[in-house]
Structure formats: structure tokens, C-alpha cells
Amino acid sequence: MYSANKIEDEELAAKLPEPVGYKILIAMPEMSEKTEGGVFVPDALKKQEETASIIGYVIKAGSEAYSDIDKFPSGPYCKEGDFIIFRSYSGTRFKVMGREFRLINDDTVEGVVEDPRGYSRA
């Protein structure tokens, strides 16, 4: 249900907030218009999936993200440019120029995926 969208619009990138502390700024992939089987996804379902989304693209991390050695003894879970899986409904949601972003805590990241296409909430 997700598409692999990265931030390529320079005007949009310039308007994004700088994450502070332990926060990670992520871009939310846009929802596909159709399922893998070719069925169109209704707008209400797309909105529900966007709200409960579990996949994001890491734009930038705050200066203190993953700095707690006791909590992250093996280092950061993710880096800029990674697609991540995070807890549903987590983070502060906001839109810039019609595109959704979130600020999440560093310990909310649960996994890294190479390509978000083909993933959906269970």
C-alpha cells in the first residue's frame, strides 16, 4: 500500500523543521491508489492508513538521537535515507505543502526496510 517516495522538492525540503533532542523527522510515503490486485483504495481507507501508518523515510535525526549508550549500546537503529517501521499512531503528525511528516522518538523505530512497497499494517 506504500510507494517509495523520497524528498526531492527543494522548496519543500527548505520548509521542514529541524528535529531537536531525541526526535527523528520522517516523511510518510504516499498511499497507493490501488491495491496489488488492482482494486482502487477508497479515500476514507487511505486516510485511515495514513493515520495509522507504520512506514516512514528518515529525513534527519536530532542531535541527541541515539546518544544514550545504555539504551542503544550497539548504536543507532537507523540513519538518514532509511525506510523504517515504527509504532502505529506514534509521533507528532503535520503537513508541509500537502505532504505528511512526523517527528518520532528515536526509541520508536522498530526496524529498517529496504523498500516500503508491499508492506501494509496487519
PLM segments and residue spans:
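Compact, glycine-rich, soluble single-domain proteins
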Residues: M1-A122
